[in-house]
Amino acid sequence: MSFASRNIGRKIAGVGVDIVYLPRFAHILEKYSPFDPCGRSTLNKITRKFMHEKERFHFSNLLIEENCLTPRLHEYIAGVWALKECSLKALCCCVSKHDLPPAQVLYAGMLYKTQTDTGVPQLEFDKMFGKKYPKYQQLSKNYDSLFSTHEFLVSLSHDKDYLIAVTNLVERE
């Protein structure tokens, strides 16, 4: 069964779109090079604000694989940023902004980017969010059914200097 066939008829609870300028992320990685101890320290502070620990671990592995700044690194970090931005927009379609934690908590603690074995990007809810962030347990209680009955369908595309991310928050199959 094709992807489209499996997903026809699923209710969409929210949609988000974000576009980023890749040279902006290339500049950040050049200015705060992960291959320089001083730069690495500053880059870690920056990435902790929007990358989940699982994404930072994956980024560390990419740094080892690449061993220098490459478009793959720029695209990874920009893709994570763009997915977080558009996931917030999708969540705001069905969750009151007043009920959501600050963007930094949502980005670095609640959601993380993964991919399937075939390389298709995915955005996952961290099931440990309520335990890691007790201050926001009420969010988990109020919206637990949303997080257990819905998932993000995501798409990333890049061409030259731009990367675009789209998220649809949909009912699970």
Swiss-Prot record:
**Top EC class of this enzyme:** transferase
Q: Which GO terms describe its biological process?
A: fatty acid biosynthetic process; holo-[acyl-carrier-protein] biosynthetic process
Task: Identify the keywords attached in UniProt to this record, alphabetized.
Answer: Fatty acid biosynthesis, Fatty acid metabolism, Lipid biosynthesis, Lipid metabolism, Mitochondrion, Transferase
- InterPro entries, from UniProt? 4-PPantetheinyl_Trfase_dom (IPR008278), 4-PPantetheinyl_Trfase_dom_sf (IPR037143), PPTase_2 (IPR016614)
Q: Which SUPFAM superfamilies does this one have?
A: 4'-phosphopantetheinyl transferase
Q: Where in the cell is it found?
A: Mitochondrion
- EC id: 2.7.8.7
Annotated transmembrane regions: none
GO CC aspect terms: mitochondrion
Q: Which reaction does it catalyse?
A: apo-[ACP] + CoA = holo-[ACP] + adenosine 3',5'-bisphosphate + H(+)
The entry lists its GO molecular-function terms as: holo-[acyl-carrier-protein] synthase activity; magnesium ion binding
What other comment is given for this protein?
A: Present with 486 molecules/cell in log phase SD medium.
Q: What does this protein do?
A: Transfers the 4'-phosphopantetheine moiety from coenzyme A to a Ser of mitochondrial acyl-carrier-protein.
Q: Which family does it belong to?
A: Belongs to the P-Pant transferase superfamily. AcpS family.
UniProt name for this protein: Mitochondrial holo-[acyl-carrier-protein] synthase
